[in-house]
Curated annotation (Swiss-Prot):
One of its GO terms (biological process) is symbiont-mediated suppression of host complement activation by activation of host proteases. The lineage of its organism: Viruses, Duplodnaviria, Heunggongvirae, Uroviricota, Caudoviricetes. This is Staphylokinase. Keywords: Pharmaceutical, Plasminogen activation, Secreted, Signal. One of its GO terms (cellular component) is extracellular region. It is found in: Secreted.
């Protein structure tokens, strides 16, 4: 009887220990790791491939600061066109991350542009390319031969108003 009880308890403990391992594995595999690269912090994942980093300051028509949201990174693909309308859409998402549905974009600063800095392997020096924000837009260049995760940066003031 004692042997049977010990065997039963051993089997029961093994079942519980394997079920906790199985649950952790299934939970960790549900996150699509192919789209993100793990950074230094375990809770931080940055996009793999090119991304648009939106770092804006929301001002009213007189230039008074209304909102200064944290920067937000959006994955983009080489060959796609970034128009003024699309960029305003990304800016509104960045505003919503801080104040959800409270503000709308009126206009971007006329001098606003998107910049990317990378080490050009052919010229053997650091390059910075600037792209103006226009209605027609610009095509995102493929910089994969120079850099794995090129960050296209939009850092500007944006005129916003309450919705």
């Amino acid at each position: 009887m004692l042997k049977r009880s010990l065997l039963f308890l051993t089997v029961l403990l093994l079942l519980f220990s394997f079920s906790s391992i199985t649950n952790e594995v299934s939970a960790s595999s549900s996150f699509d790791k192919g789209k993100y690269k793990k950074g230094d912090d375990a809770s931080y994942f940055e996009p793999t491939g090119p991304y648009l980093m939106v770092n804006v300051t929301g001002v009213d028509g007189k230039g008074n600061e209304l909102l200064s949201p944290h920067y937000v990174e959006f994955p983009i693909k080489p060959g796609t066109t970034l128009t003024k309308e699309k960029i305003e859409y990304y800016v509104e998402w960045a505003l919503d991350a801080t104040a959800y549905k409270e503000f709308r974009v009126v206009e971007l600063d006329p001098s606003a542009k998107i910049e990317v800095t990378y080490y050009d392997k052919n010229k053997k020096k650091e390059e910075t390319k600037s792209f103006p924000i226009t209605e027609k837009g610009f095509v995102v260049p493929d910089l994969s031969e120079h850099i794995k995760n090129p960050g296209f940066n939009l850092i500007t003031k944006v005129v916003i108003e309450k919705k």
